[in-house]
UniProtKB/Swiss-Prot annotation:
Any one annotated GO CC term: extracellular region
Recorded family membership: Belongs to the DEFL family.
Localization annotation: Secreted
Descriptive protein name: Defensin-like protein 34
Signal peptide as annotated in the record: 1-25
GO biological process per UniProt: defense response to fungus; killing of cells of another organism
Covalent S-S links between cysteines: 33-59, 45-68, 49-70
Record keywords: Antimicrobial, Disulfide bond, Fungicide, Plant defense, Secreted, Signal
């Protein structure tokens, strides 16, 4: 019975760690992505973030509400 609890705890920890996006904090820029579906075809968001001395960026959000987010670390 104890081994089942330990196994469950380890699986739970792995699930949390896999969704944590290690080393990737995201900074909201307030810049709306041009495509309503969040596709940064011209790489404008990434270029903006690189020019602001971040590690890059991408469009994050949901339909018609995608915003540019820059990556840190």
């Amino acid at each position: 019975m104890a081994s089942n609890k330990v196994s469950f705890f380890l699986v739970l920890c792995l699930c949390v760690l896999s969704t944590a996006e290690f080393g990737e904090a995201q900074i909201l820029t307030g810049i709306k992505c041009p495509d309503p579906n969040g596709h940064d075809k011209e790489d404008k968001c990434n270029i903006y973030c690189l020019n602001q001395n971040y590690m890059g960026g991408s469009c994050q959000g949901y339909k018609n509400h995608y915003m540019c987010e820059c990556y840190v670390g």
